[in-house]
Amino acid sequence: MQNQRIRIRLKAFDHKLIDQSTAEIVETAKRTGAQVRGPIPLPTRKERFTILVSPHVNKDARDQYEIRTHKRLIDIVEPTEKTVDALMKLDLAAGVDVQISLG
């Protein structure tokens, strides 16, 4: 797997969960002898929703809600076979979306 790179993108609503998962991935990759770049924090996406509280009148009465999507990027440079096997066996939290691409 020389001259290869594994790029891992993580997404989660909870920043503590995504930081914990990133730490696990980085620790696993370093333990197997791969060089790690990151974790790189990507911009947080904030979705805001405004909802009318009253069903009929009172346009001024509104509630506002927000969902934040936190993102991290990890590059694993020159991964070994042990690195790939260890990453495949890694069990991450349920609230974290993981996208892996080889480049």
Curated annotation (Swiss-Prot):
Gene3D superfamilies for the chain: Ribosomal protein S10 domain
PROSITE patterns named among the record's database cross-references: RIBOSOMAL_S10
Keyword Ribonucleoprotein: yes
Hydrolase as UniProt keyword: no
GO molecular function annotation: structural constituent of ribosome; tRNA binding
InterPro entries on file: Ribosomal_uS10 (IPR001848), Ribosomal_uS10_CS (IPR018268), Ribosomal_uS10_dom (IPR027486), Ribosomal_uS10_dom_sf (IPR036838)
SMART domains for the chain: Ribosomal_S10 (SM01403)
Alphabetic keyword roster: Ribonucleoprotein, Ribosomal protein
GO cellular component, one term: ribonucleoprotein complex
Protein's GO biological process: translation
Any Pfam family the entry gives: Ribosomal_S10
Subunit composition and interactions: Part of the 30S ribosomal subunit.
Cited HAMAP family: Ribosomal_uS10
Family, similarity comment: Belongs to the universal ribosomal protein uS10 family.
Function according to Swiss-Prot or TrEMBL: Involved in the binding of tRNA to the ribosomes.
PANTHER family: 30S RIBOSOMAL PROTEIN S10 FAMILY MEMBER
Protein name, entry field: Small ribosomal subunit protein uS10
Lineage: Bacteria, Pseudomonadati, Pseudomonadota, Gammaproteobacteria, Alteromonadales
